[in-house]
Structures are given as structure tokens and as C-alpha cells.
């Protein structure tokens, strides 16, 4: 799939006999300093859910869900749907801190009977005009698997058990089980009384959101025992659920020892500042504009923090085979509008390196994201929604996630050799190889010779995102970073522009 809409057959016809007969020298003939060599043997399955997005009503802090909803027509804004289809998230998660005081029944049924709620974390009142049914409808329209985060007894946070006016906001296993029935039980009376005859299938559920982050809340053992109670109640409503438990802050080992038989995934989050231990970071506030070269250097090293975080989680789970679910993740930098540097293309290139880290750990990491989904202000958003008018557009992180999502294989393969300056991962589906290539040089292109161990190539094409790393994607100029599609030359040589992110598709003979 690609944005030009051309099929593989049309492409091959367009490039003609030259591409069809394309033969790239075998790997042994391309061992120079500029060689990019791939071992095509499959290593492990790559999950499609490495491209998840995360939707949370953020109240007065950021427009998010309220900005994406058309209150006049009681539907999602068409421009939000359109741009999300281009982003093509494989999974969409509803929840976050909001889940700790969310009572789902207030947001279903007739609109004039829905009960507004105090958004205690993010400020203001949420109208609850967007609830379970609307969220599932959004997921259907953009072809994303829905994931719901339950109210896990307010995650043990006393300050969220009641709102300032005394309304009880905590909910237990029975309410979670009723939610499962509302979604999945063909005979659920409440849903049918709302005029919805057929189920709204919801197979993925997370129990606990950042439960370990609060002081004077649940400890790990208490959370694990409550996780079991929730899991049993929810599975009594539907035995075919996929459940994710909370395991961050050193909880993973104990959580899995106590509750692991009830869980399919263990979750953690990573909202991070790679320069948090450094004074005078160029990534804070608007400092990034003063010294672009220094900013670039810091952004290109940010992947190390992501690598360390995932490795730490793998150490926590040890030999337990339960896969990891990174259900929230993004840069968290101080400054106006939350991480302003993230509007720059330089940050897009940095996020591509983080995606490559995810793929390298794809044997254990099976769910991941790199952004909040949508909003009007925060630069950590994947989709920016102009208000009061204008068309929604993809931020740099979304452009990279979209590129990878549309050009990725099902199985990881090994990158044997790369030229200096390139960060490369590779995958495969059948007779097609996919390379994700990041040029980490700010001002220098990198020329390379592509080769595959023991194979020739039938055809190749390159999908390339490139632009000035200092360019900032804002509502007035959302198209400053362009996506181009090009045929790979018959000699297999290619030059990756400075500060570029590319997806390379290589067709290999099956015989």
C-alpha cells in the first residue's frame, strides 16, 4: 500500500523490462564501506500493533477528543477521519489517567441523558458525548483494533475516588465486567435498550494505568490480586478477551508471578526527556532554534534512552515469555506547548530511530506507540487539529509512523552491514523485503550499494521523506516535508539524502 495508490503490477509495468530484469550483485560482491547487506532469513514475527495510537479526553489541557468531535452533527470530524486513515494506526487505545475516574455508563445511551463528568486530571467538564460506541465507531472507520483501559478502582489513588462535588469515581470488577457485556454480549439488555442490536466487539482490555506511579496507592501485591479479580470477572462475561496488566516501576516480575496466568501482555510507559540529567539542554523551550547542529546531535542520541528503557523492562520480566506492551510513549520536554521542538522535522527523524528500536526488540515488544493521538496544542500529538477551522494534519512523528506502517513486513530479518550514518532495520513478507532507513547525518547524504545475501532482486522502489531538519510543521505549512516514490536503479545503488527517513521495498525471487 502507498500514497500514490499504484499497485505493484502497475509499478512494474511502468518501469518496464529494466526493473523486471534488475539484478543487484550478490552480497559477497558488495562488501565495501558503502555496502548495505541484508540476510533475508526470517527471525521473528513483527506485530502490527507496533503502530498503536492512544486517545484520551484531555479536558482544558488540550482539545484532543472534544476537538475531533463535531458536536453539531454528532459525528467525528471528517478531516480527522481522513488524516487518521492515512496514518493507519493498527490499534487505538482509549484511556490514560482519565480511566481512573471514568464511569462508562455515563457516556452511553441517549445523548440528552448522558452525564457530564469532572475531568480531574486534565481540567474542565467532559460532556461524555463521546463514549464507548463512538470510540468503537471511530476504530471501525479507520480500521484500527480498539483497546479499552478499565477503571481499576481509581488505580488506588484516593484523590480520584471522588470528584470535588462528592461523586464516586472509582469502579470495581463488576463494572468492568458489565462493560465487557455491553460491548460483546449479543443479548446485553442495556446496549439493546439503547437501540444497538448487534455487539460492538472489544477484545483488548488493559487493567491498570500507571498504577505504580502514585505514592500511597496500591502496592504491587495488592494490584496483582485486584488484577486477578478483574480478570476473572471480565472473563466470566467473555472468556475470549486479551488482557494487559500493569508492570512498570519494577512491578513486572511480581505481577507476572501472581497474576501472569490471567494476562497476555505486561504494560509499561515511557514519557521521557533524554536530557533530563543535563543542564542547558537545547531541547527545552525554544532553545532548539539557537543551535540547530547541537539540537540535531541531542535528538539523534535520544534513541539510547528508549533502548535502555526497553532493555530494563526485559530484565524485569526475565525468562517469562509474556510480551511487552508500551501503551504510552513520547518525548516529554519542558517548554511552551509541551515539547515545541517536536514540530520540527529533526524530531521526525529522531522518532524514526525510536521506531527502529521497537523493531529490533520486536521479538518481545508487541504493542507500542510514540505519541498522544490528537489535539490542538501539545506537540507530542500525532495529529494536530486546527481550531476553530482548518484541516487536521500529521505531525512529524505521525508522518514517520505512517511511512513505516504502510511499508513493513511481517517478519524481522537481519541487517548484516550498514554504511556509517545510516540506521537500518529490515523485515520480510513473502517475496518482498522492507528496509527502514534513517540518515542520521544532518547535512550529508549517504551513498550505498544494496545487496541481499544469496539473492538477486527482481525490482525495487524507495519511499522517501525528506526536508530541512529545521522546518517546523504547523497548521499554516503542513506540507513542508514531502513524501516521494522512486524506482531503484538497475545497479542497486542509492543515495539517501541528509536528514531523511526512507522505506525501501525490494522484490526477491521466490525460487
Where are these regions (language model features)?
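Active-site flanking residues adjacent to catalytic metal/cofactor-binding acidic residues
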Residues: 209, 327, 438
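Tight coil/turn sites that cap or link beta-strands
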Residues: 497-501
